[in-house]
């Protein structure tokens, strides 16, 4: 950087991304710098825009489901959960109790997947490589649970309107239970390595600070909001599935900085493990999808002897089901915050309009206020603490 005649560094405008290892996706930031200090950030989005909301209007309600796996591809089951809840509200459909338990189990496993990746990458952005190697080994085990249940490691399409695609295979719940028993040891190791580490604290404490009022004004949700000291969690405030009968705490921070966001996510991982233990202990037997054959397909073995089952199967996968005219909004406490789906139905087999509320969009818009006055080296840490994925931001 060249110096001006009076000895001060000239203001400079630089590009951060869209191809940058710390950008967490195809993000382009226009930085206005004064020396090493950030004076202004202009985020440019849309580089991963695929027109998801418009594409959904041309698909049946079942065909639209896989699009939600591809939004926040780090935590896919949370999004298909929100979509399924929204369609079920329009249909007036009740889901069997076992399906509700399994939905919560996989949504909490999804929370583990998301928060583990975030902690690992935030540490990597700060210069710590060891947690990444430890954590990715455990994430692979969770992804294997995904694969055994749905056949896919990422894009599962497992949670569907009316219940689940299928029941879990024998032995899977036992393996998840075993995982919840030994996993806290790894979490303790990561905790010991990072939480009181002086370099980690220097890189995160008082960096990217947000006040309670700013968080509310920007529309924050999830760990970003709770790190500011506001205990808002949809699983507690607007319970869905079986969260109203589960015992868990809502971790909150106090300073609203990068360090508090890290602490909140680590605490949420432990709470998710506690929720998993309760679900695995209490889960009942029974069906995992509604018995309304106009919504959920019959079992495969029924097709061999029942003409009626064959007709239902053919109609569901060729034409789909018609959803009563109306509109509905459903939101879930996704790992990144409040993920909402708003659907308008015109009484046909395809949505008239589908609007998606992604938490990362609200968080990214605050990056200018969060990073202003900080050094350039602090920017990757702030981006890491935001926990953004551009599949859901650009849609």
Swiss-Prot record:
GO terms for molecular function: NAD binding; NADH:ubiquinone reductase (non-electrogenic) activity; quinone binding. Pfam families: Complex1_49kDa (PF00346). Keywords: Cell inner membrane, Cell membrane, Membrane, NAD, Quinone, Translocase, Transport, Ubiquinone. It is a peripheral membrane protein. The keyword Membrane applies. The keyword Membrane applies. It is an enzyme of class 7 (translocase). GO terms for cellular component: plasma membrane. InterPro entries: NADH_Q_OxRdtase_suD (IPR001135), NADH_UbQ_OxRdtase_49kDa_CS (IPR014029), NDH1_su_D/H (IPR022885), NiFe-Hase_large (IPR029014). It is found in: Cell inner membrane. Its EC number is 7.1.1.-. Belongs to the complex I 49 kDa subunit family. NDH-1 shuttles electrons from NADH, via FMN and iron-sulfur (Fe-S) centers, to quinones in the respiratory chain. The immediate electron acceptor for the enzyme in this species is believed to be ubiquinone. Couples the redox reaction to proton translocation (for every two electrons transferred, four hydrogen ions are translocated across the cytoplasmic membrane), and thus conserves the redox energy in a proton gradient. NDH-1 is composed of 14 different subunits. Subunits NuoB, C, D, E, F, and G constitute the peripheral sector of the complex. This is NADH-quinone oxidoreductase subunit D. It comes from Anaplasma phagocytophilum (strain HZ).
């Amino acid at each position: 950087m060249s110096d001006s005649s009076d000895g001060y560094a000239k203001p400079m405008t630089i590009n951060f991304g869209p191809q940058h290892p710390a950008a967490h996706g195809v993000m382009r930031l226009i930085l206005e710098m004064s020396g090493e200090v950030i004076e202004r950030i202009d985020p440019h989005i849309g580089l991963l825009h695929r027109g998801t909301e418009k594409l959904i209007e041309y698909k049946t309600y079942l065909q639209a489901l896989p699009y939600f796996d591809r939004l926040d591809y780090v935590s896919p089951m949370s999004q298909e959960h929100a979509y399924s809840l929204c369609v079920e509200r329009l249909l007036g459909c009740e889901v069997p109790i076992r399906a509700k338990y399994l939905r919560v189990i996989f949504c909490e496993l999804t929370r583990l997947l998301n928060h583990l990746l975030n902690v690992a990458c935030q540490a990597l952005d700060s210069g710590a490589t060891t947690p990444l190697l430890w954590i990715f080994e455990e994430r692979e085990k969770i992804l294997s649970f995904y694969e055994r249940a749905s056949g896919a490691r990422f894009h599962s399409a497992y949670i569907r309107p009316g219940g689940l695609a299928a029941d879990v295979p024998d032995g899977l719940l036992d393996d998840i239970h075993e995982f919840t028993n030994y996993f806290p040891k790894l979490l303790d190791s990561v905790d010991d390595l990072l939480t009181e580490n002086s370099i980690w604290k220097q890189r995160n404490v008082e960096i990217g600070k947000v006040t309670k009022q700013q968080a509310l004004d920007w529309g924050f949700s999830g760990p970003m909001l709770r790190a500011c000291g506001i205990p808002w969690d949809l699983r507690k405030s607007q319970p869905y599935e079986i969260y109203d009968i589960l015992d868990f705490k809502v971790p909150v921070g106090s300073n609203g900085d990068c360090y508090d966001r890290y602490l909140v996510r680590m605490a949420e991982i432990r709470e998710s493990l506690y929720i998993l233990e309760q679900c695995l202990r209490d889960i009942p037997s029974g069906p995992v999808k509604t018995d309304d054959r106009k919504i959920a397909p019959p079992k495969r073995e029924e097709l061999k002897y029942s003409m009626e089952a064959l007709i239902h199967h053919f109609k569901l996968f060729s034409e789909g089901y018609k959803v009563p005219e109306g509109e509905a909004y459903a939101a879930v406490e996704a790992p990144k915050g409040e993920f909402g789906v708003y659907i308008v139905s015109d009484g046909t087999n395809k949505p008239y309009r589908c609007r998606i509320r992604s938490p990362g969009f609200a968080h990214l818009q605050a990056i200018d206020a969060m990073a202003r006055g900080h050094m350039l080296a602090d920017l990757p840490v702030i981006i890491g603490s935001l926990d953004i994925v551009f599949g859901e931001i650009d849609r």
